[in-house]
């Protein structure tokens, strides 16, 4: 990956050093159009030897050091939060019966106290990386635990977590401690020394690939047509655009098209000197918005920290030069960097040029091979076909960010006793701490295998496991993603072969989305609709809740037969026909046509509607009494409407209690919405303080256990209770959400089936 012209050159003082030692200037390069545009001449890449010399050109270390410091700081902040140190005991509690999803089944978590030690090593490595203290060792101390934790749980994989591991891997081989580091204070050889150009080239190439491949993946028809993030435009951040655009056009033009153009162009805008200021403005605005739109941890800030890598490497020195002199004494050096053995210096023809050594050739080879590998991996799914589902590959290294949104309407897990034939149902997600397994065949296979090991403890022998999972991707019909007739315990799965029990995504039905949106918009606010598509030969068994007093099914395409189980009646529906479904009963919908059937459930939650009407009446009555238009005195059971709480007297009705709880909740939301900035900031900081406080205390407890042994259970319980305290938060504040908020204690497997109403 090349660098821009200004980025490739050293600062003025550094140029002087090179001229004194090498006896040549870069005047010719400055005069060449290619040199000005790309930072190198064609002759610099005309042979392997010249390319090695180019990639090892001495470059100012200042910008690289600033990125090292900021990236290390982001990782220090990330470990207690998104890496899960604050909730580690909930995820890896010893003896917890839970199904896990590592990349390799042989990869298992260590005992809890040892997991805290792993995280401690990772934290110290990130801290050492940030400070540039024993830099190479610190990078390794961070890198190895990070990838161990990352590979331990596929359900937590995402693009930015993968990117962190890549950046740490790159920094391990770089000389990022040659400026603004503790190592530089301890070693004169490392203090303010040149770094080879490939250090910048690899990082810039990585960030360029992230932007550009993300843009290429957004050329998907769903993104271009505005289906991927359809509801994102409702966020308050897009309010300014709605002064001139409708919400639909804001979603299409601003969210989707502008997002596509930004990803495709960001790398180029940052690369070239003439457009860099515009690129910095756009990507900074983009990542600041993302920090508010999504819960993606440190990712926006890491990307913000990476943007200055595209600027001239000496920009920190220029910044320091504009600071007050007293402050300059505390800031990094402004003097020109000293020569380094890691670089190749050009000399005069009389003296002969410096010949690149093995380390220089290895650095150049690493740069080329690494960037080629990063360009290949997002399109390598033809090799790992077992991980392909409706989208290609495990979510992470493909850079297909936000392209696919899913909704799950119905999930049913059925088990059959292999000896007795007895059928039973499991709560979806039992024995798990994540929901991502529903979309990935490899995780489903791991989940079924785990359940087959756990169910014999509950008197289910030789269990067979069947999954009926309905998913809608990017506003399509809800449809099955896996064949519900296949026992996943015995089903074959290979990482290198297509999954035979994966159902195809019904792409032929995608044009229906416009019609489906028209149907939705034609319904009133109290009517809900769910669109279903099913395969020939399969049927859907569903239960209509008693709360849904007005439920009907209407056929859109194909032919279905509806069986009312309790009444033992069948009715066949042709296209356009509909029928009423009784509440509180099961029914089955069989697809009879040779092609997939499409139908929709239309229903009204009559119980919820009646409650809303009653609450609206109480609100109206309260307002009438307060403004004096209601002359009749309120009965005693309704007095809490005026007081806002129960103060003696008769017990209010459940309806009044529900009204009071809603009023209190609305008042709290309004109070928070109108809270001054300093109050919001304080609440945010206190929640973060709790996360770091709990992380620190639980780590101390575990390290003590490893060194001195575990105390009594009573003492441990007291220590954990103390770690869970929130002494800094005001009374009544809700608990902050943890990294993993799922229930660590799964339900019993013989619980009643959970039926999701359509």
Swiss-Prot record:
Fetch the InterPro entries from UniProt: HTTM-like, HTTM_dom, RmlC_Cupin_sf, VKG_COase, VKGC_lumenal_dom
- Which residue ranges have biased composition labelled Basic and acidic residues? 12-22
Provide the GO MF annotations for this entry. Answer: gamma-glutamyl carboxylase activity; vitamin binding
Instruction: Provide the disulphide bond pattern.
Output: 99-450
Transmembrane regions: 61-81, 114-134, 137-157, 293-313, 362-382
Instruction: Please give the chief subcellular localization of this protein.
Output: endoplasmic reticulum
Residue positions where N-acetylalanine is found in the record? 2
Q: Would you name any one GO CC term?
A: endoplasmic reticulum lumen
Question: Where does the record place Low complexity bias?
Answer: 734-750
Which parts of the sequence lie on the Lumenal side of the lipid bilayer? 82-113, 158-292, 383-758
Query: Which cell locations does it reside in?
Result: Endoplasmic reticulum membrane
Reaction(s) catalysed (UniProt annotation): 4-carboxy-L-glutamyl-[protein] + 2,3-epoxyphylloquinone + H2O + H(+) = phylloquinol + L-glutamyl-[protein] + CO2 + O2
Domain of life per record: Eukaryota
Instruction: Tell me the Pfam families matching this sequence.
Output: HTTM (PF05090), VKGC_lumenal_dom (PF22777)
- Report the membrane topology from the UniProt record: Multi-pass membrane protein
UniProt-listed Enzyme Commission number(s):
4.1.1.90
Q: Cite the record's note on assembly.
A: Monomer. May interact with CALU.
The record's function comment reads:
Mediates the vitamin K-dependent carboxylation of glutamate residues to calcium-binding gamma-carboxyglutamate (Gla) residues with the concomitant conversion of the reduced hydroquinone form of vitamin K to vitamin K epoxide. Catalyzes gamma-carboxylation of various proteins, such as blood coagulation factors (F2, F7, F9 and F10), osteocalcin (BGLAP) or matrix Gla protein (MGP).
Q: Note on file? A: The vitamin K-dependent protein substrates of carboxylase have usually a propeptide that binds to a high-affinity site on the carboxylase. CO(2), O(2) and reduced vitamin K are cosubstrates.
Q: Which family does it belong to?
A: Belongs to the vitamin K-dependent gamma-carboxylase family.
- What name is this protein filed under? Vitamin K-dependent gamma-carboxylase
User: What's the source species for this entry?
Assistant: Delphinapterus leucas (Beluga whale)
